[in-house]
From Swiss-Prot, chain A:
PANTHER family in UniProt: ADENYLYLTRANSFERASE AND SULFURTRANSFERASE MOCS3, UBIQUITIN-ACTIVATING ENZYME E1
Cellular component, GO annotation: cytosol
Cofactor(s) recorded in Swiss-Prot or TrEMBL: Zn(2+)
EC number: 2.7.7.80, 2.8.1.11
Alphabetical UniProt keywords: ATP-binding, Cytoplasm, Metal-binding, Molybdenum cofactor biosynthesis, Multifunctional enzyme, Nucleotide-binding, Nucleotidyltransferase, Phosphoprotein, Transferase, tRNA processing, Zinc
Residues binding Zn(2+), per UniProt: 231, 234, 306, 309
Domain of life: Eukaryota
Function description: Plays a central role in 2-thiolation of mcm(5)S(2)U at tRNA wobble positions of cytosolic tRNA(Lys), tRNA(Glu) and tRNA(Gln). Also essential during biosynthesis of the molybdenum cofactor. Acts by mediating the C-terminal thiocarboxylation of sulfur carriers URM1 and MOCS2A. Its N-terminus first activates URM1 and MOCS2A as acyl-adenylates (-COAMP), then the persulfide sulfur on the catalytic cysteine is transferred to URM1 and MOCS2A to form thiocarboxylation (-COSH) of their C-terminus.
Signal peptide residue numbers: none
Species the sequence originates in: Drosophila yakuba
Protein known as: Adenylyltransferase and sulfurtransferase MOCS3
Similarity field: In the N-terminal section; belongs to the HesA/MoeB/ThiF family. UBA4 subfamily.
Cofactor: how bound: Binds 1 zinc ion per subunit.
Main location: cytoplasm
Curated annotation (Swiss-Prot), chain B:
Key words of the record: Cytoplasm, Molybdenum cofactor biosynthesis, Nucleotide-binding, Phosphoprotein
Secretion signal span: none
Cytoplasm recorded as keyword: yes
Residues modified as Glycyl adenylate: 90
Alphabetized InterPro entries for the sequence: Beta-grasp_dom_sf, MOCS2A, MOCS2A_euk, Mopterin_synth/thiamin_S_b, ThiS/MoaD-like
Gene Ontology terms: biological process: Mo-molybdopterin cofactor biosynthetic process
GO molecular function: molybdopterin synthase activity; nucleotide binding
Subcellular location: Cytoplasm
Full protein name: Molybdopterin synthase sulfur carrier subunit
Length: 453, 90
């Protein structure tokens, strides 16, 4: 075999093995969920028989075990924390929403510190692009539910922690039911609808909400609904327009930045539970990782006319948050449909018919992404330079030739459609098309050894 | 807006999305010593191209949130404004 064939065979086999491992993890997850639902049905029946439909009373710990003392000694000797702090933590329950870049370090520190009960919510499954920041998940757990993967890692860290997995999307119909069972909620989510949902639900159930977020090199942290502090809606009554929201998959993020904020969420949760120090409520912490600067902004107290947390609320039950925000409650991207099919080209057709012909192939991704991988003939013109027309100077001569087909390309085939609309307006006589599905489609349909990010 | 009165030079810090839109992490602007918060917001939005996020940002004067757009803001030389849109990633 030629070297290139060996390469492509190797990457095909590696991908197939990874897919099989992920499928195996998913099957095991289904089995666990089935077993869990059978056993919870059985225990529900027992409770009905025993006439104890109320939430099962939990024994309150009043003493530390010798193992506790040995394990937590370094924090027990903190004068403000001490035995009483440790007992409060041991009797506490924290719900972590999102087991990603924020949720992993937050859960890790809470479990390690001896939090008695952790609830983990995540609808998503572990994949390789998670590992650089979602530090509880591992290669061998690809395809497994993130909540389950985190549970395995956390129990290894601290087997005394009781962990409940909720491997599903949090939405209006299940939120109150799930959140009710916990003392403190951590918003480690990655999207705007979930942030409003959690804030409203926590106001209704009077739970403090430790809210963290991060993107690129920036992080933010505050505690909502604590004391006289505001809720999320007091600060942001109106959701941002979808086009002003960037997710980590598009904007990128450094693991050490999410890690910084996630660890601080654990810290604030511990302070709330133990009653330690000054909780970060009524203040917003802004972390700029690129300059290493932290700032505290004094934010408002409750908004007197807040629709949810004021004395006369207009919203008294949970609403449809995806509709309210005009966005999905995930950070997954939805393929855009801006162009009709005859304005587009499949990667297979491009490969078979056009690639060997004269044409102009313009890759509209940001330069940092172009440097990761690129097709051989592609020239890089980031979308912003298409939209502000600065590309015109660069291609002056080439663009005079109406016979030269112009093909635009990006990572997934969304930005390239925006670029086609713009270029076509300027050159209505040219053939201007984009590649459907972008480089992801190229890897899937033409060249399996081309990297995916 | 009172364009004839005294002006002072104020630092403006941009965070998250506003940094992308303004294309800089910090800038300086000349502002009247007294201005209503809504005029100030308008001025910053048009000067730095912040229209997409104008209804979704925290405007902080010397690290304090400006919560009332009808409020009159008093500036002195070297004051600091911060523009902080929400972050939702995680």
């Amino acid at each position: 075999m030629m070297e290139s064939e060996v390469d492509s065979e190797q990457s095909r086999l590696k991908r197939e093995i990874a897919e099989l491992r992920a499928a195996l993890n998913r099957k095991e997850q289904c089995l666990r969920e089935l077993e869990a639902s059978v056993s919870s049905d059985a225990s529900a029946e027992e409770q009905v028989v025993g006439n104890a439909l109320e939430s099962p009373g939990r024994a309150v710990h009043t003493k530390l075990t010798n193992d506790d003392i040995a394990r937590y000694s370094r924090q027990l000797i903190l004068p403000d924390f001490g035995v009483q702090g440790q007992l409060k933590l041991k009797n506490s329950s924290v719900l972590i929403v999102g087991l990603g870049g924020l949720g992993c370090p937050a859960a890790q520190y809470l479990a390690a510190a001896g939090c008695g009960r952790l609830g983990l919510i995540d609808y998503d499954e572990v994949e390789r692009s998670n590992f650089h920041r979602q530090i509880l998940h591992s290669e061998s757990r690809c395809g497994m539910s993130k909540a389950e993967s985190a549970r395995i890692a956390l129990l290894e860290l601290n087997p005394h922690c009781e962990i409940h997995c909720h491997s599903r999307l949090l939405y209006s119909q299940n939120a109150l039911h799930i959140i009710r069972g916990y003392d403190v909620v951590l918003d480690c989510s990655d999207n705007v609808p979930t942030r409003y949902l959690l804030s409203d639900a926590c106001v209704m159930l009077r739970k403090p909400l430790v809210s963290g977020s991060a993107l690129k090199m920036d992080g933010q942290l505050t505690v909502y609904n604590y004391g006289n502090g505001p809720c999320y809606r007091c600060i942001y009554p109106v959701p941002p327009p979808p086009e002003a929201v960037t997710n980590c998959g598009d904007g990128g993020v450094l693991g050490a930045v999410t890690g910084t904020i996630g660890a601080m969420q654990a810290l604030e949760a511990i302070k709330v539970i133990v009653g330690l120090g000054d909780v970060l409520a009524g203040r917003l912490l802004i972390f700029d990782g690129s300059s290493g600067l932290f700032r505290n902004i004094r934010i408002r107290s409750k908004r007197p006319n807040c629709h949810v947390c004021s004395a006369q609320p207009l919203i008294t039950e949970l609403i449809d948050y995806e509709m309210f925000c005009g966005m999905h409650a995930t950070d997954k991207d939805n393929p855009l449909q801006l162009l009709s099919t005859d304005e587009r080209l499949s990667v297979k057709d491009y490969h078979a018919k056009l690639q060997a012909q004269p044409h102009l192939l313009i890759d509209v991704r940001p330069t940092a992404e172009f440097e990761i991988c690129q097709l051989p003939e592609a020239v890089n013109v980031p979308l912003v330079e298409i939209l502000d027309d600065s590309y015109l100077k660069r291609f002056g001569k080439q663009l005079e030739d109406k016979e030269l087909p112009i093909i635009l390309l990006c990572r997934r085939g969304n930005d390239s459609q925006i670029a086609v609309q713009h270029v076509r307006n300027r050159f209505p006589m040219h053939s201007v098309r984009d590649l459907i599905g972008g480089l992801h489609a190229w890897t899937n349909s033409v060249d399996p050894s081309f990297p995916i990010y | 807006m009172n364009a004839d009165g005294p002006v002072v030079n104020v630092h403006v810090l941009f965070f998250a999305k506003s940094r992308e839109l303004a294309n800089t992490p910090r800038s300086k602007v000349d502002l009247p010593t007294e201005i209503t918060a809504s005029d100030l917001l308008e001025l910053l939005v048009s000067k730095f191209g912040l229209t997409p996020i104008r209804d979704n940002l925290i405007l902080a004067h010397n690290e304090s949130y400006i919560d009332n757009l009808s409020e009159r803001i008093l500036f002195k030389e070297g004051d600091e404004l911060a523009i902080i849109p929400p972050l939702s990633g995680g």
